[in-house]
């Protein structure tokens, strides 16, 4: 599905962003690396739920109506980007990802409950991640 490919694209972009942050801001390295790893876990979780019901979705002619522009984000940081600015960018990324997963959950309600539940779970986990980032930003600002 286009939505699944797009979810992978978003997760991979976000993972690369956190990987770069871990290399630049070594004091927070473990946190950023854990976020990058979690992104892969999220994809696995969603794929497992989605492909478990895909035959039902195809029979029902299900399709996501996802506008990639609405969820796109920038991952580039200049060499001079301060940690506080990097954290603000991370918060923007998380907000886009939460919106994507919430919208995907809403659109997939007609599928078996596993798919929207998986999308909602990732949105919830990303909300918790956003809270961690906000706390870190408050300390560093």
Q: Can you say where each PLM-predicted feature lies in the sequence?
A:
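Non-heme di-metal
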Residues: 1-141
């Amino acid at each position: 599905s286009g939505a699944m490919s797009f979810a992978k694209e978003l997760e991979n972009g976000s993972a690369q962003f956190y990987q770069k942050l871990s290399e630049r801001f070594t004091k927070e390295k473990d946190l950023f690396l854990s976020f990058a790893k979690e992104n892969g876990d999220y994809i696995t979780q969603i794929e497992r739920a989605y492909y478990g019901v895909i035959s039902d979705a195809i029979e029902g002619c299900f399709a996501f109506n996802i506008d990639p522009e609405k969820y796109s984000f920038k991952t580039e940081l200049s060499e001079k980007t301060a940690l506080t600015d990097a954290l603000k960018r991370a918060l923007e990324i998380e907000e886009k990802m939460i919106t994507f997963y919430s919208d995907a959950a809403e659109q997939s309600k007609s599928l078996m409950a596993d798919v929207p539940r998986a999308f909602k779970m990732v949105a919830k986990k990303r909300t918790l991640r956003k809270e961690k980032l906000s706390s870190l930003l408050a300390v560093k600002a």
